[in-house]
From Swiss-Prot:
Primary location recorded for the protein, binned into one broad class: other
Keywords on record: DNA damage, DNA recombination, DNA repair, DNA-binding
Effects seen without this gene: Stationary-phase cells lacking this gene are more sensitive to ionizing radiation. Growth rate, ultraviolet light and methyl-methanesulfonate sensitivities are unaffected. The spores formed are significantly more sensitive to dry heat, high vacuum-induced desiccation, X-rays and UV radiation, but no difference in hydrogen peroxide resistance exists.
Name of the protein: Non-homologous end joining protein Ku
Transmembrane spans: none
Functional note: With LigD forms a non-homologous end joining (NHEJ) DNA repair enzyme, which repairs dsDNA breaks with reduced fidelity. Binds linear dsDNA with 5'- and 3'- overhangs but not closed circular dsDNA nor ssDNA. Recruits and stimulates the ligase activity of LigD. Probably involved in DNA repair during spore germination.
Coiled coil: none
Lineage, highest ranks first: Bacteria, Bacillati, Bacillota, Bacilli, Bacillales
Superkingdom, natural source: Bacteria
Length: 311
């Protein structure tokens, strides 16, 4: 029986409350359309935390300087561009802030309209649902229906979170979708792939057999029938361990043992220091040479007696 955990996957069934991730506008000629952006996809990867094997407490990562090995706080860290190995151009917060203000126009500017088939999917990056902003419903509907009627998509420039990107605008179901796409210099050339043969070296029989197999496996695309079997198996394994009570609890924070050890060491060092003058060698204590011989012997015997009485 295939059982998949539901309580522990943090998934909500039914209506999903869309979180507005960006507000701005689409510039379409002289038309300005207020919009809101929403994430169109979500990461379903199962997040596994790294734990200390001995006590199952989560581990943490610290930002450490590779030179002085000092753990750094956020205000001690700056950004830098490595122009050659080990050499950097430092960019201050003021540098980055001024650049952000220059390019963060909160507008998606449509610059061209093209056919979707002209863009290879290798350029596609991330998808966003575009919803109408305040008082933008009519203009939004106009753009959507114009795109639907012409079968065209819009090519646009946009800036989100200080990053300028190229994007397309198209109709998906009854909604406008914006997809960020890569710039040409971000797409590597297929000619750089090693080992790819330049010419075909298959015979007609082999080719026809492969075509027949493709024809037999050809079907209508139904995304619902494709599943992440590894994720399901991992969830099942987690569920089995929960049912068998194979769980671990993060322990309470351990006391700072090193501080205690250091304190004991400091106290012991203090005790040793108080005893050290009584244990000096005769050569290191010339001041006692002026004392009468009997007084020195008597004092030494008294000290030994006290030491033996307290041991």
């Amino acid at each position: 029986m295939n059982r998949t955990p539901s309580l522990h996957t943090k998934e909500k069934k039914g209506f999903i409350d869309m979180h507005t991730m960006w507000k701005g506008s689409i510039s379409f000629g002289l038309v300005n359309i207020p919009i809101k952006l929403y994430a169109a996809t979500e990461d379903k990867d199962i997040k596994l935390r790294s734990l200390h094997k001995e006590d199952h407490a989560p581990i943490k990562y610290e930002k450490v300087c590779t030179n002085c090995e000092k753990t750094l706080s956020p205000d001690e860290i700056v950004k830098g561009y490595e122009y050659v190995k080990g050499k950097y151009v430092v960019l201050t917060d003021e540098d980055l802030k001024s650049l952000k203000q220059e390019h963060e126009e909160k507008a998606v500017e449509i610059v061209d309209f093209v056919q979707l088939q002209e863009i290879d999917p290798i350029y596609f990056n991330r998808s966003y649902f575009v919803g109408p902003g305040d008082n933008g419903t009519k203009a939004y509907t106009l753009l959507r229906e114009a795109l639907r009627s012409t079968g065209k998509i819009g090519i646009a420039n946009m800036t989100i979170r200080s990053k300028q990107q190229l994007a397309i605008l198209r109709v998906y179901e009854n909604c406008i979708v914006m997809e960020s796409i890569h710039y040409p210099d971000e797409v590597r050339s297929a000619a750089q792939v090693p080992g790819v043969p330049d010419q075909s070296n298959v015979n007609d029989k082999e080719l026809q057999t492969a075509i027949t197999l493709i024809d037999e496996l050809t079907a209508k695309f139904e995304p619902e029938k494709y599943e992440d079997t590894y994720r399901q198996a991992l969830l099942q394994r987690v569920n089995d361990k929960l049912e068998n009570k194979e769980t671990a609890v993060t322990p309470d924070k351990a006391p700072p043992r090193e501080d205690v050890i250091d304190l004991v060491s400091a106290l012991q060092a203090s005790i040793d220091r108080t005893r050290r003058p009584n244990r000096e060698t005769p050569a290191a204590a010339p001041a006692q040479a002026a004392e009468p011989k009997g007084a020195g012997d008597k004092k030494q015997k008294t000290t030994r007696k006290k030491a033996s009485g307290t041991s």
